[in-house]
Amino acid sequence: MPKTVGVAVSNATFHFDKLYTYAVLPEHQDKVRLGSMVLVPFGRGSRARMGVVLACDAEPEHSKLKFLFDVAPASACLTPELLRLVHFLKERTFCTYYEAVKAVIPYGAQYKPTVAADGVTPVLQKQLVRHTENSYRLAGTLPQKPKPTAKQLAAVALLGGGPRTLTELEEKGISRAVLDNLCTKGVLECTKVNKSIDLYASIPLQNEPIVLTQEQQAAYDALLPKLEDAAPHSALLYGVTGSGKTLVFLKLIARCLELGKRALVLVPEISLTPQMILRLKRQFGRRVAVQHSALNHTERLLQWQMIQDGGADIVVGTRSAIFSPLENIGLIIVDEEQEHTYRSESAPRYSAHEVARQRAAENGALLLLASATPSTESFYAARNGRTQLVRLTQRYGGNPLPTVQIVDMRAELASGNPREISLALEDAIRRNLEAKKQTILLLNRRGYQTMAQCEDCREVLKCPKCSVPMVYHKSAHKLLCHYCGSQMDPPPTVCPTCGGKLQYRGFGTQKAEEELAKLFPEARVLRMDQDSTAAKDAHEKLLAEFANHEYDIMVGTQMVAKGLDFEDVTLVGVLGIDSLLFAQGFRAYENVFSLITQVVGRSGRAKDPGFAIIQTTDPDNPVLNLAAAQDYDAFFEQEIAYRKLGLYPPFCGLCVIGFAGPKEIEVARAAARFAALLGQQAAKQPDLPLRVLGPTPGSIEKINDSYRYKLTVKCRNDRRFRDLVRSTLDCYEQEKLPSKATVVVDLCVIPRNNARRLQFQ
C-alpha cells in the first residue's frame, strides 16, 4: 500500500513531462498501484488533472506533498505490459507520458475530472458508462416436481457447460421468464457482467479444414518451429498476389490457439477488415475481437473490455490494435506490411512494426510480416538473414499472374481521344461487361475536378489556409480543401487575382464515375473513396454489395488496390498514376510499384485469367514496366542500389524534425536556430554518425494557416542519437526565443540490425 506515488499528468509539455510526487490518503492506499488512473491537484491553483501512476513510494521532492483527489477502479489500471509500452513510446517517439497512455487505451476506457454531488470535491468520472448484462450459472439441481418444462431442461443442459449470458441463452430460444423462474427456485444464480458485443454475430462458424497447397504447406512448415519456440522470432512471408497468404495465416493461428496462446492480426486500412474478419469468424467463431477507428466509442470500449477480460483469442484491426490488452500472445501478423498507414502521424508518432517487434519480444511470439511487395527495408533484412524469408511464388490454384498492357496517353490524345479513359480500356471494360465479369479501376484522386485555373494569368486557385489547390466536388457543388476542410460555396467562376475566367481541370473519382455512366449506361458503377465511405459500416456494406454482384465496376482510390479478393474481377485499370510516379520523397518509386502490383493482383484470382491496363504519359518508365511484369526482385535490385547511393534506409535511419507556426519568417528562423544547436550538441560526440539536411520548407509549405519547415537528419537510430535530440530540444527550450515555432520529432524506424552497420563517409 504505497504512501507516495509518482504521477505523469495530462496536458504536460515535453519539457515539463516528468513524474510528480503525490501523497496517498489512507482510504486510497489499497486501491493505488502501478498503472492506476488518478485525479491530482496540479499547479498553483491545484486544478484537477488526470494522471497515471508510474512509480510507487516515490521519493518526495519536498516535505509538503499534495494528496491525490481520486483513484479509478482497478479495471481501469494499465496492465504491466501496457505500462512498459508507455515507457517504450515515451523513449522512442518523443511524446509525453500521457500521450502514450491515451494511445494504449481507447477513449471509452478513459476517465475525466468532475465534481462530486457536494459540488466541491474533485472526483473521476468515466468517459462512457460500461454496459452490463445478466449472466447465469447453475446453483442447484432442477426439482422433478412439478415436472420441468422442455425450456427449463434445455436451459439447465446449456448451463451445464458453464455460465452463459442472457443474450446467448435467448439466441438458443430460452426466454428471460424461464431463467427468472429457475433463479427463484434456486436452480440458477444471476449476476451482472460487463456486456460483450459481437459485432459480426451473423457470420456463421464453419470451421472447415484448412487445406494448403504444397507450396503453402512448405511455407507453414518453415514458420512452425518459430511459432512453437518460446523465444521471440521474426519472419517475412513474401508471396505474389493471389498466392494464398491468408490461408497460411489461418493455419498458423489455429496452431497458435492449440498451443494455448493468442494471435494479433493487423491490416493497414479499415476497408480491409471486413474480409479478414469474415475469414477469421468463419474459422474460429465468437472469440474474435475487432479494434479500429470506425467503431463508435461504445463498440470499441466493449471490444477492448472483452479483450482485457480474456474473452478474445484473436484480435484483428488497424494500426491502433497493436495496443490491445491481449495477453499471452504467440503470433503477431502484419499484413501488407509495406503500407505507410502503419505509421502514426500524430503523437505518439510510432511505427506499428516497432511496437509489434517490442510486443513479440515481451511475449516470446512470432512476428510475421507479409506482403506481395515488401518494403525495401524489410526485404533487405530478410535477404541478409536478419529475419527469416519465406516465399510463395505461385498463385493459389495454379492461376497465372494477370497480363498487363501499358497504354501511352500521349498517343491517345494525338489520335483524337481527349478522355481520361483510353480506347483500349473502354474496349476491355465493354468485353468484360459482356462476359458478366467485374472490373476495378484505380484513380487515386478524390473529387470531381482537381483544380481551378485562370485562363488568363494561369493562377491556380488555392486554399486560403493551405498551399494546395482546392478540389471541386460536384455532388456537393463546392470547392473543398482535402487538408483543412475549408470550403468555397458556391464555386467561383472568376479569378480572384485578375478577374479572368476560371477553367476547372483534372479528373477525380466523381468525374470518373460520371464518365463511366455515360460510356456504359447499362453498367452498375460503385465509387469507393473517402466521401462515399464516410458513413458508419460503409466499407463493409459496399464491398459486400460488390461481392454479391450488385455492381459491375468499382472505381476508387487506394482503398480498392490491396487485400481485396473477388473471384469474378478479371479486369483492372490504373488511371492517373503519373502524379504518384513523380511525387517527392525517397519512397516514391516503391509506393508506385507497390500500388500498381497490388491493384493488378486483384484480377484473375479464380478460374478466369486476369488482365490489367496501366495508363500513363511515361510508358518507358522502368518502375511501371517492372510493376507490369510483377517482378519484385528486379525492382528491389534497382531500388536498393538507389538507396545505397543516396544513403537512404535501410542504410541509415531518418529523423525529420518539423517546425510549424503562423509566421513563416519566424518558423524559418526557429528551424535554422535548432539546426545550429543540433550541430553544437553533435560536435561533442564526433564519433556519432550524422548528416543534417536543411532546414527547408515542407513539401506542403502551409496547412491550416500554419507554415512548415523541416530538418532531415540521416542518423543511426539508437539511444545515443535520441539523447542528442533530447539535449538539443532542451537547449532550444532554454533559449526563450520570441514566438518560437512548435517542434515535432518523427523518427523513421528501420530494423536495428541494419542500423548498427551504418557508416557515413
Language model features: what each stretch is:
Residues M1-S371, R383-N399, Q681, R719-Q761:
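Accessory, non-ATPase domains that flank or precede helicase/AAA+ motor cores in DNA-metabolism machines
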Residues P2-T4, D17, S46, K436, ...:
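A general secondary-structure signal for short beta-strands and their flanking turns/coil
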Residues T4, D17, V32-L34, A424, ...:
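A short, contiguous, amphipathic alpha-helix enriched in charged residues
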Residues T13, F520-A523, L678-R691, E735-K740:
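Short secondary-structure junctions
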Residues P60-S75, T696-G698, K702-K714:
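Solvent-exposed, membrane-proximal periplasmic/extracellular interface segments of envelope transport
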Residues N207-T213, Q217, D221, A230-A668, ...:
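Inter-lobe coupling/hinge segments of SF2-like helicase ATPases
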Residues A676, Q680-I703, Y707, V743, ...:
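A carboxyl-terminal module marker
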